[in-house]
Amino acid sequence: MAALTDGPPGADGRAVADRILVDPVPMSRLTREGRAFVVTHETVHVTWRAHLAGQAPIWLQEGFADWVGYEGTGLAPEVIATDALAAVRRDGVPGSVPSTESFSAAGAAIQSEYQRSWVLVDLLIAQHGLPKILDLIEVATTQGAPNDAERAADAALASVLGTSRAEVTSAWQQRLASLAGSPATR
């Protein structure tokens, strides 16, 4: 991991003194563009945590931070999601969106989770537009445990986007399969 965001929450649950912690060894292995991506990604977390109390599902947090980091780079989805698409070709599409537990993986497995999350957020932005996804983030962010965030996201998907987790998951699986050139079954 090249960097992470950390800091204490204030009385209202919003971050009051976040900082981006950089590990110089992994950062030194990145290209200039890679370093810019990492700093942008972490800056999204700082901004999110300063303005919204609590947390959203990890797929939304990490997928959106990656989306902002990659926006404007001109990289193709197949390049951005290389590890995730290799996993789809090998194992088929995942049965569910990335979870807190799946983000505890190491190596290429964790990269796949970030990339799967990016594909999901990229798909939602393509379908609904960035303003709606910003609304989704606000409504889906809640104080409490990760399961509370998942329930808040389910409610936000319905109220903000007029869809359900099942519909979003199905569209995401189809998108992964299409990008991987693989059938959408597992």
Where does each model-flagged region fall?
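Active-site scaffold of zinc-dependent metalloenzymes
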Residues: 2-36, 40-50
